[in-house]
Amino acid sequence: MQIPLSDIWRQFRGEQDELYAAILFQIRIPRTFAAILLGGALALSGYLLQTFFHNPIAGPFVLGISSGAKLFVAVVMIVFLRYSRTLSSVDLIVAAFAGSMLSMFCVLLMSPRVQNMSFLVLIGVMIGYICSAVTDFLVTFAEDSDIVNLHNWSMGSFSGITWENVKTIVFVVAVTGILTFFLSKPMEAYQLGETYAKNMGVNIKMFRVLLVILSSILSAVVTAFAGPVSFVGIAVPQMVKRLFRTAKPIIMIPACFLGGAVSVSYTHLRAHETLA
């Protein structure tokens, strides 16, 4: 249902129509806020992974992190719905984080045996396909009601977002984003090489662990509430880097978040206009 701009302005001036007010304040605005926050989180997650692997095609979807999160959320949804239990925002985030960490752990487990980082990305792609295959298998044998919920969620949509979800998203993204910003100086040193970073006093092992955890949390919160969303984590950091002509993390971190927020929210609004 399309709402004219004049009617939207009237809602904010206090001349409220009950139907328009319900649609605007309970459906449209929460989804738009979620698109902004989750888009920024996804782009930031991609930037962290590209920094970690020194590879421009690394991202949460390519490395199988989103697929691992999708698998665990699918399992939790099937189990909870089968026993008529209500899924909370925390349940979704914990399940998605566990899945994303497991996928990332599998990739890192192979890293000591692999010399080429590009091959490590291919391992992530393989893990992603395995997780997707297992998810499809579970959906095939799930009950009809479970399939409907899983299908709607797995398409990558903001349609189920509520104000309670937005509160959780704001908290998780804000905390993770602030922690990421504090890593800007170690990230800049790490971009110049591990030897240089060590000489600058960076604890490489701890730094890598923090990158993995932060990128997994950001990817998990996106997958938990919007389903698996691809390409944003890969494309936006590269677009931002070329736009600002810099690779400095202190600029790239907020710029990637802003770029992801703009691209996803714009896509969400355009898709809604097309399908409305």
Would you name each region that the model predicts?
Residues 1-276:
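Alpha-helical transmembrane segments in inner-membrane proteins
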